[in-house]
Amino acid sequence: MTLLECLVGITLCALLLNPLLKVSAHLAAKQVEHEKTQLLISEAERALELMGRAIRIAGYQNIKTYNPSKKVDASKQFIQVNKKVGYRGSDSFSVQHALSDGVDFDCIGNALTKDRTRKDLAYQGFVVERQAGVAKGSKVNGGSLICQSLDRQGRLQNTTLMNGVNHLFVEEIQSPRGSGDKGQRVYRLGLQMTDGVLLQVHLERTVATRNLP
């Protein structure tokens, strides 16, 4: 085989393999994109579940400690929504509730006890803030979803649940007709996740309160 024949053979092989290599690279990139998307969806679903659980328990009163003679404004004390106060105009919200006779947990998994309350009420809050430790102007993959809860001295503590949160919105919507529950309120939660490059995932969930008076 002459040198010319070798060169021709190599060229033909390259022509045949090049499309296959491009397809393989494209498939690999799509696989990575799919895995990143699934991870973002999983994180968003976890966050929405935690926030939904907090809304459902908002306003819970233990019958053993409940004082019916004490009038409270449930809309102000048990659940509060603050619009456009967080990262990139994200909303935030907080809830308060009494402790049940069982085992309750806050948004970071701490078992709730009396020393983690204020005025016998547990507190949970959710807000999106800029990622800590990142210089201003640096490119980041969204903000951080912060869980606000009380420590064993009843002091407010902030804990990062996850990064990659681009936006959080909380909207109160009309209660379902025929619910017959004047205290029930319904909220739409929306969470936009990002990898900071190309991917953006948006998930929503509708949650109704169960314990408001």
Describe each PLM feature range.
Residues 1, 21-24, 31, 126-128, ...:
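Broad hydrophobic/π-residue packing in well-ordered secondary structure
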Residues 1-62:
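Aliphatic-rich helix starts adjacent to a transmembrane/signal segment
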Residues 8-9, 18-20, 61-65, 127-137, ...:
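A generic short-segment signal for beta-strand/edge and adjacent turn/coil regions
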Residues 12, 16-21, 25-28, 69-71, ...:
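Compositionally biased, low-hydrophobicity segments enriched in charged and small polar residues
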Residues 28, 33-34, 48-49, 61-86:
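Solvent-exposed N-terminal domain segments of exported/luminal and surface proteins
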Residues 36-39, 56-58, 65, 83-88, ...:
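Short linear sequence signals and composition-biased patches located at protein termini or domain-edge surfaces
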Residues 71-167, 202-204:
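Surface-exposed loop/linker segments characteristic of extracytoplasmic
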